[in-house]
């Protein structure tokens, strides 16, 4: 069976400005871009197996994206990795905040209002591990 690969689209006002944010603030790279008349209209950004498409082609959809990004690690390692990610992103000036959707989230809003949710599935919204009784 063939593995599937998804690349969700985030709709943005200005792809070049969004590329600067995703690369400079969030640590992504950009393997390709589609340009027309000297302007970038679509680009892919990647980081550690996570691929997203940035596009300015549907203005009515700008800022309405929501992506859940999960780390494929054991729970303790995942918590440590997300805490390290938060420290890294805050050092670049990325707008990082706490969130909750039944469990703790690390939330980043891009310049257009699209949201990236990095989840801590091994913890409840209170910050306690699922098996923690204290």
Residue ranges and their predicted role:
Residues 1-19, 67-71, 119-134:
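N-terminal beta-strand motif that seeds the catalytic metal site of vicinal oxygen chelate
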Residues 37-41, 62-63, 100-104:
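Short acidic/glycine-enriched loop/turn segments that link adjacent beta-strands
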Residues 48-52, 59-61, 74-78:
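Short, charged/polar surface micro-motifs in flexible loops or helix N-caps
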Residues 9-51:
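Core segments of cupin and vicinal oxygen chelate
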Residues 4, 41, 48-50, 63-67:
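Residues that flank catalytic or metal-binding motifs in active/ligand-binding sites
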Residues 13-16, 67-115, 120:
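Vicinal oxygen chelate
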């Amino acid at each position: 069976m063939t593995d599937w690969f998804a690349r969700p689209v985030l709709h943005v006002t200005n792809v070049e400005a969004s590329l600067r944010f995703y690369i400079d603030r969030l640590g992504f790279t950009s393997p390709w871009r589609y340009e027309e008349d000297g302007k970038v209209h679509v680009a892919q950004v990647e980081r550690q197996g996570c691929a997203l498409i940035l596009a300015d082609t549907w203005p009515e959809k700008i800022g309405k994206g929501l992506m859940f990004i999960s780390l494929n690690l054991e729970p303790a390692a995942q918590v440590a990795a997300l805490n390290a990610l938060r420290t890294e992103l805050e050092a670049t000036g990325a707008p990082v905040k706490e969130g909750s959707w039944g469990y703790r989230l690390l939330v980043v809003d891009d310049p257009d209002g699209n949201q990236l949710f990095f989840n801590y599935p091994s913890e409840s919204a209170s910050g306690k591990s699922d098996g923690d009784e204290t």
